[in-house]
Every structure is written in structure tokens, then in C-alpha cells.
Regions:
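A conserved beta-turn-beta hairpin within the catalytic core of GNAT-like acetyltransferases
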Residues: 58-70, 80, 127-128
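Conserved GNAT acetyl-CoA-binding A-motif
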Residues: 89, 96-108
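Conserved acetyl-CoA-binding loop of GNAT-fold acetyltransferases
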Residues: 120-129
């Protein structure tokens, strides 16, 4: 099975939308391809999009440098366990390094043990902190 990781293309829109809905149940993607602060990544196998990852560029105003947040990492169920997620994470790291990013950051629910294993395998370190968020809009 050959997995190719590449930059998202507008032709991937429908496939990514289906994948996001299956993974997160309520999300619907909008077109952000013209926004320079976002970099979308897909994994492809035999012409089918089987993985998606979103990188968001964020400026740290204290250090006057940027970092990247990784969001919406998802892999089609039948392709899990074949290294798709790891390949996308490696691509994201290479991209962020190439663009001068200070670090990569992501959040993950504590119940997603398999995802935690992937992130730790890719060199991410679980930090001793809690995230607080207040929803302003309910979906």
C-alpha cells in the first residue's frame, strides 16, 4: 500500500468533507485554500484521499515568531494502522520547519489513547497543563 502525502487541492473538498463528518460527526469544511495562515495536508492511496490534517500558523507576539497548531487529524477507518497519520505528521513537521516555525502544538482528548500513541511516536510530549475553553457559539 503506497501512501502519498501532499498539499490539499480544491478537488479534494468533497472527500475531505466526508472524512471530517465521519471522524467528528458535525463538522463541515469551508474553503480556506486562499488564506495564507492555513496549510491543509491530505494523504492519498490509489487516488483516494484517506487522511487529512490542518496546520494553522499563529504569531507569538512576545517572541515575534510564529508556530503552528495541528488540527483535525483524521484517517479513514480502513486505513488506520498503516502509517498514514505518521506520514502526515512528518509532512507537517517538515513544512513547519521549512517555514521557520518555532514549534508544533496540538490538543487531543484524553480518551483518544491511540491518537496519543501516534503523537508521542512522532516526538510530541504531553504537557502538564489543562486547557480551558468557553464556547461562544453552539453548533
Amino acid at each position: 500500500m503506497e501512501i502519498r502525502v501532499r498539499e490539499y487541492d480544491k478537488k479534494d473538498f468533497d472527500g475531505v468533507n466526508i472524512m471530517l463528518y465521519e471522524a467528528f460527526r458535525r463538522l463541515k469544511k469551508i474553503d480556506i485554500s486562499d488564506n495564507p495562515n492555513f496549510h491543509e495536508v491530505v494523504a492519498e492511496c490509489n487516488g483516494r484521499v484517506v487522511g487529512y490534517l490542518l496546520l494553522t500558523k499563529v504569531l507569538n507576539p512576545i517572541r515575534n515568531r510564529h508556530y503552528y497548531i495541528i488540527d483535525y487529524v483524521c484517517v479513514v477507518r480502513d486505513y488506520r494502522g498503516y502509517g498514514v497519520g505518521e506520514k502526515m505528521m512528518n509532512y507537517a513537521e517538515e513544512y513547519a520547519r521549512h517555514c521557520g516555525g518555532m514549534y508544533l502544538q496540538l490538543t487531543c482528548r484524553w480518551t483518544r489513547i491511540e491518537a496519543h500513541k501516534l503523537y508521542e511516536k512522532c516526538g510530541f510530549v504531553k504537557r502538564e497543563s489543562d486547557i480551558f475553553r468557553k464556547e461562544l457559539i453552539w453548533y
